[in-house]
């Protein structure tokens, strides 16, 4: 039996439905046309998932469940992308069944492998989710903690796995009581990490004291405020998780003694790479701006959105004008060289936080390399 305070249950249930809707909408709708289309799509997928689950728990084989999901996607959800619907429903159903050991083991194992292959469509993990949507449960089937990808395309992906686990553990250690029985929990990280992420996160959580968690989160908050790592080296915790606009709320939370009163929405940081690039373009229009940091290869890395093809030829980069950086999804556009003029540091205030990127600024014919650490703002 999972022992958890009533207020904590309320917090989790409160964001359960919105989390499902948030996770099941396509990126192009996010923050664009409001939540109407998102809600319609999410509600439809959720209802279909419940229908499949109700049929699955009667004892259907894995093959029949898969066939049923395909049928539902092609009939009830035919106006939406098949892959998005199929893998969202399959993930939901498989994890619920797995928790209760009611599913064909081979089917579940196959499903986990499929998740890794298609992680960009699983529960919308190609988006950066709000923190208030990072923990939710399906009330009838026990708790299911889904930690969305807390990193953005602007963060170095290669060495973030441990830190994502650690950050998750820090949050959980404050959200739940110290005598928490995590039996029955599934913690699913959509980053291509490990299959034993649940065990590692719970181990971290059980070992972290409240004092230690607050200290580490305070260091993170300090890093977000100053753009410098308070721990003495570049912090790989994603500063975009909480956002500069929420630092004061975070600090208040860390310093508060009444964790039960925490409102998860206060830590909300809404972020979409397209919005960031829109803001970037508005701030840079008609001004000189180019990326100076090209990484170890000394070349820009550019990818088309479809197929993620890479170019390392600078002329091709200038021609395509899409600078992608280290992210996985989306594309970044720069102005054509013909439009490059002057760019001043004042324009940085309108840009989003983009760690580990440098820009080349021209001031009265003098080029200066600046760290690109502008203030995070809500551009919507």
Language-model features: where?
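Metal-dependent nuclease catalytic cores that hydrolyze phosphodiester bonds in DNA/RNA
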Residues: 1-141, 186, 274
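Short, polar/flexible loop-turn hinges at active-site or ligand-entry regions and domain interfaces
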Residues: 27-36, 57, 154-157, 178-179, ...
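Mg2+/Mn2+-dependent nuclease catalytic core
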Residues: 107-222
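Short, charged, low-complexity amphipathic alpha-helix
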Residues: 211-275, 367-380
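Glycine- and acidic
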Residues: 29-31, 147-154, 261-269
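Extended, charge-rich alpha-helical segments
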Residues: 272, 279-380
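Hydrophobic/aromatic-lined pockets within catalytic cores
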Residues: 25, 53-57, 152, 169-177, ...
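Short amphipathic alpha-helical face segments that pack within enzyme cores
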Residues: 44, 163-171, 269, 275
């Amino acid at each position: 039996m999972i022992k958890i305070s009533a207020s904590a249950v309320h917090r989790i249930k409160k964001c359960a439905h919105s989390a499902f809707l948030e996770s099941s909408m396509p990126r192009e709708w996010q923050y664009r046309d409001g939540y109407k289309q998102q809600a319609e799509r999410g509600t439809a997928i959720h209802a279909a998932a419940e229908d499949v689950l109700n049929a699955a728990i009667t004892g259907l084989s894995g093959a029949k469940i898969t066939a049923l999901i395909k049928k539902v996607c092609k009939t009830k959800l035919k106006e939406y992308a098949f892959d998005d619907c199929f893998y969202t429903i399959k993930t939901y159903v498989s994890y619920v069944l797995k928790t209760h050991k009611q599913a064909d083991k081979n089917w579940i194992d196959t499903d986990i492998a499929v998740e890794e292959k298609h992680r960009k469509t699983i529960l919308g993990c190609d988006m950066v989710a709000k923190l208030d949507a990072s923990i939710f449960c399906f009330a009838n089937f026990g708790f299911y903690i889904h930690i969305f990808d807390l990193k953005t395309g602007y963060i170095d992906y290669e060495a973030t796995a441990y830190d994502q686990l650690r950050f998750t553990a820090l949050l959980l250690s404050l959200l739940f009581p110290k005598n928490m029985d995590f039996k029955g929990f599934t913690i699913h990280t959509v980053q291509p990490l490990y299959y034993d992420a649940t065990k590692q996160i719970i181990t971290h959580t059980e070992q972290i004291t409240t004092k230690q968690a607050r200290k580490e989160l305070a260091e993170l908050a300090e890093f977000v405020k100053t753009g410098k790592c308070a721990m003495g080296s570049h912090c790989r915790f994603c500063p975009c998780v909480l956002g500069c606009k929420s630092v004061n709320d975070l600090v208040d939370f860390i310093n508060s003694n009444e964790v039960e009163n925490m409102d998860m929405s206060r830590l909300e940081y809404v972020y979409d790479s397209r919005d960031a690039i829109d803001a970037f373009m508005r701030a840079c229009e008609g001004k000189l701006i180019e990326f100076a940091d090209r990484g170890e290869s000394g070349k820009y890395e550019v990818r088309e959105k479809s197929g993620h093809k890479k170019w390392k030829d600078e002329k091709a980069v200038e021609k395509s004008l899409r600078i992608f950086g280290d992210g996985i999804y989306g594309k970044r556009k720069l102005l054509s060289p013909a439009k490059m003029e002057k760019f001043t540091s004042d324009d940085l205030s309108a840009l989003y936080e983009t760690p580990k990127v440098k820009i080349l600024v021209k001031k009265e014919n003098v080029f200066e390399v600046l760290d690109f650490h502008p203030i995070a703002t809500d551009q919507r």
